[in-house]
Amino acid sequence: MEVVGCKAKESSCTLRPAAMLFHGISGDHIQGIMEEMERRSKSESRLAKTVQMNGRETTMPSMSPEKPALCAGCGGKISDRYYLLAVDKQWHLRCLKCCECKLALESELTCFAKDGSIYCKEDYYRRFSVQRCARCHLGISASEMVMRARDSVYHLSCFTCTTCNKTLTTGDHFGMKDNLVYCRVHFETLIQGEYHPQLNYAELAAKGGGLALPYFNGTGTVQKGRPRKRKSPAMGIDIGSYSSGCNENDADHLDRDQQPYPPSQKTKRMRTSFKHHQLRTMKSYFAINHNPDAKDLKQLAQKTGLTKRVLQVWFQNARAKFRRNVLRQENGGVDKADGTSLPPPSSDSGALTPPSTATTLTDLTNPSITVVTSVTSSLDSHESGSPPQTTLTNLF
């Protein structure tokens, strides 16, 4: 876009100096002076036909009065001294505007043309940009922040769950199906085919097993969690597929190996096993404090890798077992005074729990479910009138 027109009429004039100005000068000298003046006059007229624009010289063609130029914007004749040349057409300074926002482009550095229409930079990128938002299908400018998922690009405000319209930010888990974005909860329910509008994540976790679902972490890559083991349902024993060494933040997606149970079949309870270093850490702290608070549980969770819920259950059962041991010792002293004796309590967990009775720990992701099942010990016969106690296998 250039200012290239100047309607300055070039007129040449012949200088006829008065004779008295050259009185006393020979004819040859007078002729030489007149030729020099004509040469300088022509040089000045040529310089008047150029203007300096953006560091470069642009020649301004003179318009003949017989064929005046027409403005491509309004269609009228251009009688101004300066005019604009864009897309090989002449424009009045006031007529070169964006066809969308009507922004005057006479002072702009660039303008864009498409199908005979003039656009400013913003409207051109908005309408004809190569990158388009996969949600609103509008153009994305080169300076705008975007969210990427697989091969799709989204505005920050358009990167939302298709079901609940929740805005997803960096670090949130989401899933994609048929080029549609879903949050973690609705993507899982969509895969399972059990979507209900009022279903929340707590109810979903209470259902038990699910399918292996891929979740994305906002960087376009799929990250897998720690695989979980399972035993055959035909064996008739509890499934030890819950790894207590993982917390909720270890995996970027929820990986479950167990298929959903039929509606008529009850979900089997989960079972927890502890590693040696986890037991050592919990036993060491239990010797100092039997009832840790929330701050202590948080520190223990960081050291052991267990969740607070698992630690709460372990300390609850440890306190119950400690009270039973103290009670048995007191009852043992009374029996000795009467001439009877009881076998001393053993630290082995096998003496407290019959081998034929299995102690299970239910799904810890749902606090509403009973955590520890009741187990009757062979020592309960010595405690007349006492209700069945709860315990956890391999506590110490």
From Swiss-Prot:
Residues 69-130, 131-193 form the LIM zinc-binding domain. Residues 248-272, 328-365, 377-396 are annotated as: Disordered. It comes from the Eukaryota. InterPro entries: HD, Homeobox_CS, Homeodomain-like_sf, LIM_Homeobox_TF, Znf_LIM. GO terms for cellular component: nucleus. One of its GO terms (biological process) is negative regulation of DNA-templated transcription. It is found in: Nucleus. GO terms for molecular function: DNA-binding transcription factor activity, RNA polymerase II-specific; metal ion binding; RNA polymerase II transcription regulatory region sequence-specific DNA binding. Residues 267-326 bind DNA. Keywords: DNA-binding, Homeobox, LIM domain, Metal-binding, Nucleus, Repeat, Zinc. May be involved in gonadal development. This is LIM/homeobox protein Lhx9. The gene is lhx9.
